[in-house]
Amino acid sequence: MKIVVLAGGRSTERNVSISSGYRITNALRQKGQQATFIDLFLGYDLEGKTVEQVFDDANTSKDLNISDAILTDEDINKLRPDGSTQLFGPNVMAICKAADIVFLALHGGDGENGKVQAVFDINGVKYTGSGPLASGITMNKVFSKEVMLYHGIQTSGFKEFKRDQGPKQTVPFDFPVVVKPTSGGSSVGTHIIHNQEELESGLEDVFRFDNSAIVEEFTPGREFSLGVVNGHAYSAIEIKVRSGWYDFKHKFQAGYTDFITPPKDLDEDVHQAMKDVAVQTMDVLGLQNYGRIDFFANEKGVWVIEANNLPGMTPLSLLPQEAEADGVDYGDLVMDIVNGKLKLYADGMTEAGLLTK
């Protein structure tokens, strides 16, 4: 198959996305697929090639390390030689239209909030992951929490603040609380807040990345994550940071966090409850093909932190580790994702197909 692995783009999670994209591309080529890496925002200079010839080259780097630098839109705009700020870079759409399917390795921003998915649906381009409606709801932590609560899924209390309200706010919860961008990921802009002064500075930082902030009650407990691929929940992975909390550095730089799968001393009933809730959360949010659900577990049960509709696929990402613990290697995982979504297309069961029936 001809497969475009679409990554990069204009997002604070750009560097994570590129690392995911390189690894996915290399794995697909090892599986005999004509996979090529394309940066959504920077595009591809054909340099005399035909679109078909693009698939002859992986177009990847051997460097999978992730910089801890958080790029702003202004930083990323400077990377594009033509000075354009259009979402799709040169030749991206033409190359994607020539593919049998596009593997979305985008994280955050327009790649995860449904905009790219909507453009592809309009243009008849097949892609992995969920459709635009489910992606938009899931990317917005306020919307997704409201959907989860409506369906009886336990999640921490929360309150939303908008940028135009300013940072001088009070919250209806006791400290500590967690402050994060409403539509962010990879813990960019996320803070654990212990007092009113920290709340104001935390909101100021969040508003650098998003027009909306979500403040959540702090939920103590053990932290877990479960991947769901084609309706099947993998075994949980427990996340144990060696110091501090599970921020960007702890997620993507080696040596800061221990990932334990299967988790030790976890009651099987609790483990099964997390699996059931993970599948239920995917279902109520309308997520398809694959995703990841993050949890806290304590004496009061399991609490969904958030859902991830395009989870990371880097060397330290959780979903590949969970799959490997269940006997599914990285190459088989990416092929399961591709084949699972192609089956949904064939059965007319994608979001676009269901909405037009």
Swiss-Prot record:
It is an enzyme of class 6 (ligase). Its EC number is 6.3.2.4. Pathway: Cell wall biogenesis; peptidoglycan biosynthesis. Mg(2+) 2 binds at residues 306, 308. Pfam families: Dala_Dala_lig_C, Dala_Dala_lig_N. GO terms for cellular component: cytoplasm. Keywords: ATP-binding, Cell shape, Cell wall biogenesis/degradation, Cytoplasm, Ligase, Magnesium, Manganese, Metal-binding, Nucleotide-binding, Peptidoglycan synthesis. It catalyses: 2 D-alanine + ATP = D-alanyl-D-alanine + ADP + phosphate + H(+). Mg(2+) 1 binds at residues 294, 306. SMART domains: GARS_A. This is D-alanine--D-alanine ligase. The gene is ddl.
